[in-house]
C-alpha cells in the first residue's frame, strides 16, 4: 500500500531504510553472485552454460550463445515499420546529444614559456554492455549504451542480453544493436553474463569495461568483479523522485510517480512535497491510474511504493530540496511553479527533468539524454552514461629547452626534500648531456 510519510516524524533508522532503497537486501545477493562468478571463473564455458540453462534457456550450447547473422537477418523482417521509425528517431537524438559531448582528441596548452601540458583522449579497445530483459524488452537501453560507445570510437562493442525460453533475443533489440554498431551479441543474462565478459571464455569475448543496469544480483556481481574489470557506474533497480509544490497538478504528480515504479518490485519511487493537500490528492489519483495498468505492472508499483517509496511530506520546499540532495535520486522530476529557479539548488541527481512537459518517459526514449544513470545514492559522485565512460585520458607534456630551464630548480628542490635522488639526478645530468 502506498504511504504518506512525514519526514519530520521518521526515526533515523526509518530514514536510513528509505535512503537505502532495495540495496538493503544486497548481502544475500552477494553470496549468490559470488558462487556463480567462481564457477564461471573456474569452468569457463561450462560454468556459463550451467547457469544459462537454468536461467536463460534450456537449450543453451557454446555454439548458439552468440547471435548469428541469420538471426540478425530474421529480426530485420519481424520489426513493425512504425516501431522502426520510433527507434530511428530515438537513435538520431541520442547520437546528436552524445556527439556534442566529444572532446578534441588532443590538446596542449603553453602554461608558461616552453612548458606545454594537456591530454590525449583515446577510446577504450573493448566494452561489454549489459542490456536487461527480465521484466520486458529494452531496445531503448541498447541505444543508450551502444550509441555513446560507438560515438566515442570503441573498436569492439559486445552485448549480453537475456533470451526468451526458446533462446531468441527480442528482434527490436537486435535491429537496434545493428543500428548502433554493436559487434557481438550474446544470449546471456544475469550474473553469469557479467562474469563471462569480465573473465572471458572460449566462446565469450573478454572486455576492458562492462556497463549497464542490473538487478540486485547484477549489482552484487559488479561489486565482486570490480577488481577484475572496470564495472562503470552503479546502475541497479530504478528509482525516482517527483518534486511537487502546491501549484503542481496532482494528476501529473501521480502519473509521473508511476513511471519508475512500474519497472519492478525493487524500484523506489517517491513524491516529495511540502503541500499536504497535494499529497492527499495525488494519493487518491494513484489508485485511479494503477487500475489502468496491467496486473503485473500494477503489482510492481504497489510493491515498490509500499516498500521503498511512497509520498514524503516535508515542512518546506527547502526541506524537500535538502532531502533530495541527501537521497541523490537516479531520476528527478521538478513539477514546481518555477522549476528553472530550483536547478541551482539541486546538487545530487542523475538527471533533472524540468516542467510539466518533461516526464521521465520522454527522457528515457526520445530526448537524447542518457537514461542509464547512477542509482543507490551514487548520484552524489557518479554521472549519467556518456561518451566519457568509453574514453580514457592520457596526460600529455612537452618541455622545450627554455621550459626545462624554467622548471629544473623546482624539480630538484622538491626531489631533494622528498629524498628521491634519481629524480634529481635525471635533471642535473641533463645539463651536461644536452
Swiss-Prot record:
Positions annotated as active site in the UniProt record: 330-331
Keyword Metal-binding: yes
GO BP annotations, alphabetical order: L-histidine biosynthetic process
Functional pathway: Amino-acid biosynthesis; L-histidine biosynthesis; L-histidine from 5-phospho-alpha-D-ribose 1-diphosphate: step 9/9
E.C. designation(s): 1.1.1.23
Cofactor, how bound (note): Binds 1 zinc ion per subunit.
Binding sites annotated in the UniProt record for Zn(2+): 260, 263, 423
First-level EC class: oxidoreductase
A GO molecular function held by the record: histidinol dehydrogenase activity
Catalytic activity: L-histidinol + 2 NAD(+) + H2O = L-histidine + 2 NADH + 3 H(+)
Cofactors, names only: Zn(2+)
Keyword vocabulary terms for this entry: Amino-acid biosynthesis, Histidine biosynthesis, Metal-binding, NAD, Oxidoreductase, Zinc
Entry coiled-coil feature ranges: none
Alphabetical list of PROSITE patterns matching this protein: HISOL_DEHYDROGENASE (PS00611)
GO cellular component: cytoplasm; cytosol
Bilayer-crossing regions: none
Domain of life: Bacteria
One family name in Pfam for this protein: Histidinol_dh
PANTHER family assigned to the protein according to its UniProt record, in alphabetical order: HISTIDINE BIOSYNTHESIS TRIFUNCTIONAL PROTEIN, HISTIDINOL DEHYDROGENASE HDH
Family: Belongs to the histidinol dehydrogenase family.
Biological function: Catalyzes the sequential NAD-dependent oxidations of L-histidinol to L-histidinaldehyde and then to L-histidine.
Protein name: Histidinol dehydrogenase
Name of the gene this protein is made from: hisD
